[in-house]
């Protein structure tokens, strides 16, 4: 328990930020899983493209705003793009 008024405020702020950060990371996880499920289910191209764009957009935003490390965002984007490109090539054939 904080002893000072300012420490109590910092604790409240920290808890709020922590909840906000967890929510943003959870959104990203849900988007990634949705895209992976669409790829596994061999969904229509437009659906997968839309999911891919939203995942990349979310990764960029979280990386720039430092909710996740920029290198992690870049690495995840690379992995997701690789999966997306593989799916698109197999869908064409």
From Swiss-Prot:
Swiss-Prot/TrEMBL keywords: Ribonucleoprotein, Ribosomal protein, RNA-binding, rRNA-binding
GO MF entry, a single one: structural constituent of ribosome
Region (Disordered): 1-25
Keyword Ribonucleoprotein belongs to the record: yes
Record's compositionally biased regions (Basic and acidic residues): 1-18
InterPro entries per UniProt: Ribosomal_bS20, Ribosomal_bS20_sf
Domain of life where this protein originates: Bacteria
Recorded GO CC terms: cytosol; small ribosomal subunit
One annotated GO biological process: translation
Pfam families: Ribosomal_S20p
Family assignment from sequence similarity: Belongs to the bacterial ribosomal protein bS20 family.
HAMAP family reported in the protein's UniProt record: Ribosomal_bS20 (MF_00500)
Function: Binds directly to 16S ribosomal RNA.
Protein name: Small ribosomal subunit protein bS20
Organism of origin: Chlorobium chlorochromatii (strain CaD3)
Gene: rpsT
């Amino acid at each position: 328990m904080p002893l000072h008024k300012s420490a109590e405020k910092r604790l409240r702020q920290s808890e709020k930020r922590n909840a906000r950060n967890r929510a943003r990371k959870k959104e990203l996880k849900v988007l990634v899983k949705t895209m992976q499920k669409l790829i596994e289910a061999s969904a229509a191209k437009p659906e997968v493209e839309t999911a891919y764009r939203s995942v990349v957009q979310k990764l960029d935003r979280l990386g720039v705003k430092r909710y996740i490390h920029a290198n992690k965002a870049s690495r995840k984007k690379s992995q997701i793009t690789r999966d997306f490109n593989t799916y698109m090539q197999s869908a064409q054939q």
